[in-house]
């Protein structure tokens, strides 16, 4: 008889009726005097192992009875299909081979507070909810690369250490760069514009840092951002790229992460409906009027906060765009429409169900003198932006782009209440550990 085949839990459906071996950790266990039910995980999925007195020797049964939570071991047994099981399959265990015994595990099978779970995040990642969320995160990341590759974009890596604030903000993390002052990047967008002038369509994807003293459920101080920039493209075509992009990412998760979505209690059919295009649009002007008509105390020229975005999101049953924001509340590089000087050709995409903004974008201004004046009027250091202005001196073209916050998108698709659930080790106003 040959050696027992070692497999992974995600592949058990291929081995029904066969005896296999799996390297696992013990999530938890229950049982009576003659049977033990082992809840197992291996990093690819979850399943149950059943240890019965009549099927194993006395030593193996005692070993199963005394296993501690998160002990690691090889488990051998026959795979059975079982519709009553949460996972559809279980193993009739015949042998257990201990690899690493566990001490008393701190995250016991009971209710724990959020602060405790994130203090123990290095262990909490092993549990079912973060497992499902990280699998969805992984699928979205792979889908992002696939979308841009298929759409003819080049991956451009923007620097993380910069000498300026791309959007003129003061919410920066300073770092010492030898004898100079530098900052952790907030966005790679300006560098992506340079890339678009060289390669046509580019995107970057990496960590960004914002020193916002905000502790809302939508803010992280370190998060992952996608910046896409497209030469020879006006805003209307950019919006079409954006909605195709989001619909594709949702579709990939719906197609490939149904088990994980079920673990999180997410309605798959509701998500699938969000892939229907085109997405609705409402102007900033009309959004303000709608809010005012519904007793919101908001004036034209003010940016929307969470209550306003939540209200607007409930008016639509899909992601939607708010277009043409006031110039005063947007970045200096955004283009103005020919008919108005008080707004810019910009758009934010908001997710439905009150999840808020997931994309921000605009058509970029190509007027050298106007951009130079904008930089000066916003009290930015002109010398730090000389390279950016060069892009308008040497063959400028119409171009547009957008930025997507990865964790905000994951929060929406996974249905998470708080954004800290969407990244392995969150960094927030009050959390820098572990």
Swiss-Prot record:
<keyword id="KW-0030">Aminoacyl-tRNA synthetase</keyword>
<comment type="subunit">
    <text>Homodimer.</text>
</comment>
<dbReference type="Pfam" id="PF00152">
    <property type="entry name" value="tRNA-synt_2"/>
</dbReference>
<dbReference type="Pfam" id="PF01336">
    <property type="entry name" value="tRNA_anti-codon"/>
</dbReference>
<protein>
    <recommendedName>
        <fullName>Asparagine--tRNA ligase</fullName>
        <ecNumber>6.1.1.22</ecNumber>
    </recommendedName>
</protein>
<keyword id="KW-0436">Ligase</keyword>
<dbReference type="InterPro" id="IPR006195">
    <property type="entry name" value="aa-tRNA-synth_II"/>
</dbReference>
<keyword id="KW-0067">ATP-binding</keyword>
<dbReference type="InterPro" id="IPR002312">
    <property type="entry name" value="Asp/Asn-tRNA-synth_IIb"/>
</dbReference>
<comment type="similarity">
    <text>Belongs to the class-II aminoacyl-tRNA synthetase family.</text>
</comment>
<dbReference type="GO" id="GO:0005524">
    <property type="term" value="F:ATP binding"/>
</dbReference>
<dbReference type="InterPro" id="IPR045864">
    <property type="entry name" value="aa-tRNA-synth_II/BPL/LPL"/>
</dbReference>
<dbReference type="InterPro" id="IPR004522">
    <property type="entry name" value="Asn-tRNA-ligase"/>
</dbReference>
<dbReference type="GO" id="GO:0006421">
    <property type="term" value="P:asparaginyl-tRNA aminoacylation"/>
</dbReference>
<dbReference type="InterPro" id="IPR012340">
    <property type="entry name" value="NA-bd_OB-fold"/>
</dbReference>
<keyword id="KW-0648">Protein biosynthesis</keyword>
<dbReference type="GO" id="GO:0140096">
    <property type="term" value="F:catalytic activity, acting on a protein"/>
</dbReference>
<dbReference type="GO" id="GO:0003676">
    <property type="term" value="F:nucleic acid binding"/>
</dbReference>
<keyword id="KW-0547">Nucleotide-binding</keyword>
<dbReference type="InterPro" id="IPR004364">
    <property type="entry name" value="Aa-tRNA-synt_II"/>
</dbReference>
<dbReference type="GO" id="GO:0016740">
    <property type="term" value="F:transferase activity"/>
</dbReference>
<dbReference type="GO" id="GO:0004816">
    <property type="term" value="F:asparagine-tRNA ligase activity"/>
</dbReference>
<dbReference type="GO" id="GO:0005737">
    <property type="term" value="C:cytoplasm"/>
</dbReference>
<keyword id="KW-0963">Cytoplasm</keyword>
<dbReference type="InterPro" id="IPR004365">
    <property type="entry name" value="NA-bd_OB_tRNA"/>
</dbReference>
